């Protein structure tokens, strides 16, 4: 059961604590996937603890036209999910929403290529996929990332995050097998409230984590 209130010193501490819980849930073969940017830092600790390879998955939120902070869907590699009931309820133009989804899909492709540095994705088929972020707000991006891992052949999908809203596990249950959330603050304002230090993560740090996570696992590539 997740704690209601606690604060992590930083992403490294959160990743270490998360790794201990995940280690009790999964067995090889496992592939850990970090969601950039901060999620890759957390994922690196999980992958190291599991002795598993580390890769990246880049979901992007689809914001409502005129209100980009309001999520009405998400995209990932080969995945597009739109909350059509919400679009209708809010009176949004579906054509504009789909145009925004297309823009975010292009950004997914650009960022994925940059983070993988020309290397192919690591093989998911027949493996347990552990999706890691530094925190979750709505769950839309995690759901899109989970759909990507299913399409890529993962036999089991686990979402693991240090912090998320109450009810996150129930929200994601239709698309994942297990959800690990260490802290569920109430009220839940934002991901950063669970951290003492929550700086922006640079792309250079993401690349360093991914490069270290790929060392010694070349045989896992397709």
Task: Name the predicted role of every residue range.
Residues 1-222:
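PRPP-associated nucleotide enzymes
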